[in-house]
UniProtKB/Swiss-Prot annotation:
GO cellular component, one term: cytosol
Tissue: Ubiquitous. Expressed in ovarian cancers (at protein level). Expressed strongly in skeletal muscle. Expressed weakly in brain, heart, pancreas and in prostate epithelial cells.
Compositional bias ranges of the Pro residues kind: 7-18
Domain of life: Eukaryota
Main location: nucleus
Modified residues (Phosphothreonine): T373
Presence of the UniProt keyword Nucleotide-binding in the record: no
Name this protein carries in UniProt: Unconventional prefoldin RPB5 interactor 1
CDD domains the UniProt entry points to: Prefoldin_URI1
Post-translational modifications reported in the UniProt record: Phosphorylated. Phosphorylation occurs essentially on serine residues. Phosphorylation occurs in response to androgen treatment in prostate cancer cells in a mTOR-dependent manner. Phosphorylated; hyperhosphorylated in mitochondria in a mTORC-dependent signaling pathway. Phosphorylated at Ser-372 by RPS6KB1 in a growth factor- and rapamycin-dependent manner.
Length: 535
């Protein structure tokens, strides 16, 4: 409820103005003031009566809501307008629709409605109390105005006397003035001088610390640059690829092998033939030196040369090597070669946005170290396992020509679909045994099929091959190159299988029926020896 407004006389003139003349209090103004105050009192009384009626209505409603849920239905007279009624029935006695305000309604029970009524009754009582206070205040004012009017009527006009009071003390403090926008604060000169000296000393210290920090960072950057320039300690993909050291070791092994061959001029053909990896490497180096080609050979070329030399030894018993070196009596030097399957480098997709890449240089270096020892049937080297990811490099399945990691490395797979070095047929030991069996078969077929050549004719050729001058000056090769074709259909080239740590898919070629029958009848030396041991 708004408090009633009362008109008050205007404020007197400021003290600085000169003292005005005496202003008499007029009787009509006093009578008007009394009338306005009486209007306020009357208005308060009317409003108090209204709110008392509302309070009585809420009391009756509370009593009705408290007894309404006692019955399920009531017979009542339903009003139709202010004068028409119709008999009806009141049902759902425990459901009450409450007006929340602004035409919003909510359903509640009778007990909840009683709580709302009590809350609204408190608001009504508070409003009535406020109105009573206002009415009492204005009633006192009305009494004062009546007394004032009686005094003015009896004694005539009442004069209002006003006097100007001067202050004896001076206000020394300065009033605060609002600063202009974007203005700088003003300070005293002494304060500025002190701050300037402190700031200069602090700036010097900060500059020294900053330059010292910059010099330290430059030294660290230089050290990091020197470390990055060294290739020996580079770490990539979780594997330390010490390529320079491995290349040096490979060169040392190759040079040592060449010196051993050049120093030993004694015939040792059987020993050289038994150590196939070593002989293959030396033969490839001899071919390069005699033909005069000093070009760079990659690791893949070395592997191809090894396979070519093995095929030539198996099929022709050293004749092709003799002709390739150009030591024939009156014949043009000829190189016989055959295409081999290049081993495929494998990238294994683990399925979690990661790809395992094999270090080719590292594997080639390990293979060359193994070949330099001269043992063709050495123990199989297991891949180094440093992290859990290295385990899955050795356990891979082939599905539709693609490498898929195993869900569990403990489960076994068929040998056709597995590329694991432990379970598949492409392990190094089995490959060496199988290659040895093929070599023995080829030697037996060569001795049986070549009727025009005898053992006496092969011995001088072997002696000539052993007594070759290894330190021949390099010359350009001017002979012919002929692609070699396999004579016997029973002999299938061995599949090119890489290191067990670098799995490949061995190519499976169909074998003719005739070849299967012939190989079923013939027995190799190794198999015969095993049968004798079993017996």
């Amino acid at each position: 409820m708004e408090a009633p407004t009362v008109e008050t006389p205007p404020d007197p003139s400021p003290p600085s103005a000169p003292a005005p003349a005496l202003v008499p209090l007029r009787a009509p103004d006093v009578a008007r003031l009394r009338e306005e105050q009486e209007k306020v009192v009357t208005n308060c009384q009317e409003r108090i009566q209204h709110w008392k009626k509302v309070d009585n209505d809420y009391n009756a409603l509370r009593e009705r809501l408290s007894t309404l849920p006692d019955k399920l239905s009531y017979n009542i007279m339903v009003p139709f307008g202010p004068f028409a009624f119709m008999p009806g029935k009141l049902v759902h006695t425990n459901e009450v629709t409450v007006l929340l305000g602004d035409n919003w309604f909510a359903k509640c029970s009778a007990k909840q409605a009683v709580g709302l009524v009590e809350h609204r009754k408190e608001h009504v009582r508070k409003t009535i109390d406020d109105l009573k206070k206002v009415m009492k205040n204005f009633e006192s004012r009305v009494e004062f105005t009546e007394d004032l009017q009686k005094m003015s009527d009896a004694a005539g006009d009442i004069v209002d006397i006003r006097e100007e009071i001067k202050c004896d003390f001076e206000f020394k403090a300065k009033h605060r003035i609002a600063h202009k926008p974007h203005s700088k604060p003003k300070t005293s000169d002494i304060f500025e001088a002190d701050i300037a000296n402190d700031v200069k000393s602090k700036d010097l210290l900060a500059d020294k610390e900053l330059w010292a920090r910059l010099e330290e960072l430059e030294r660290q950057e230089e050290l990091l640059g020197e470390l990055d320039s060294k290739p020996d300690t580079v770490i990539a993909n979780g594997e330390d690829t010490t390529s320079s050291e491995e290349e040096k070791e490979d060169r040392n092994t190759n040079v040592n092998a060449m010196h051993q061959v050049t120093d030993s001029h004694t015939p040792c053909h059987k020993d050289v033939a038994s150590s196939e990896p070593f002989s293959g490497q030396v033969n490839s180096q001899l071919n390069c030196s005699v033909n005069g080609s000093s070009s760079y050979h990659s690791d893949d070329d070395d592997d191809d040369d090894d396979d070519d030399d093995d095929d030539n030894i198996d099929d022709d018993d050293g004749d092709n090597d003799h002709e390739a070196l150009g030591v024939g009596d009156n014949s043009i030097p000829t190189i016989y070669f055959s295409h081999t399957v290049e081993p495929k480098r494998v990238r294994i997709n683990t399925g979690k946005n990661t790809t395992l890449k094999f270090s080719e240089k590292k594997e080639e270096a390990k293979r060359k170290r193994k070949n330099s020892t001269g043992s063709g049937h050495s123990a199989q080297e297991l891949p180094t396992i440093r992290t859990p990811a290295d385990i899955y490099r050795a356990f891979v399945d082939v599905v539709n020509g693609e490498y898929v990691p195993r869900k569990s490395i403990l489960k076994s797979r068929s040998r056709e679909n597995s590329v694991c070095s432990d379970t598949s047929e492409s392990s190094a030991a089995e490959f060496d045994d199988r290659r040895g069996v093929l070599r023995s078969i080829s030697c037996e077929e060569a001795t049986c099929s070549d009727t025009s050549e005898s053992i006496l004719e092969e011995e001088p050729q072997e002696n000539q091959k052993k007594l070759l001058p290894l330190s021949v000056t390099p010359e350009a090769f001017s002979g012919t190159v002929i692609e070699k074709e396999f004579v016997s259909p029973s002999l299938t080239p061995p599949p090119a299988i890489a290191h067990p740590a670098l799995p490949t898919i061995p190519e499976r070629k169909e074998v003719l029926l005739e070849a299967s029958e012939e190989t079923g009848k013939r027995v190799s030396k190794f198999k015969a020896a095993r049968l004798q041991q079993k017996d």
